[in-house]
C-alpha cells in the first residue's frame, strides 16, 4: 500500500484516537497525547461527514471534559489546530479551550 505522508499522519492520528477512545471507555483518565488525538480525530471525522468549520469548532469543545483527563491536561491544551479535508477543500479548524 503506497500512502502519502499526509495519509500516514491521518492513520497515526486515527490509531491514537481509537486507543484513547478505548481507554476512556474503560474509565481511564486520558493524558495529553491521548486527549489531543481524540479531539483531533473527532474533528477529522466530522469534516469527512460534511460538518462546517463553525460546527467543528463548537463540537470540538464537547469531546472531553475535565473529568475525562488527568490533572493539568486542560491547561496544557489552550487550543488545537487541525487541517481537515472538507468537500470543498482543506481548511484549518481551530478549537480554543477544547477541554472545559
Curated annotation (Swiss-Prot):
GO terms for biological process: urea catabolic process. The keyword Metal-binding does not apply. SUPFAM superfamilies: Urease, gamma-subunit. It comes from Nitrosospira multiformis (strain ATCC 25196 / NCIMB 11849 / C 71). HAMAP family: Urease_gamma (MF_00739). Its EC number is 3.5.1.5. It is an enzyme of class 3 (hydrolase). The gene is ureA. It comes from the Bacteria. Keywords: Cytoplasm, Hydrolase. This is Urease subunit gamma. One of its GO terms (molecular function) is nickel cation binding.
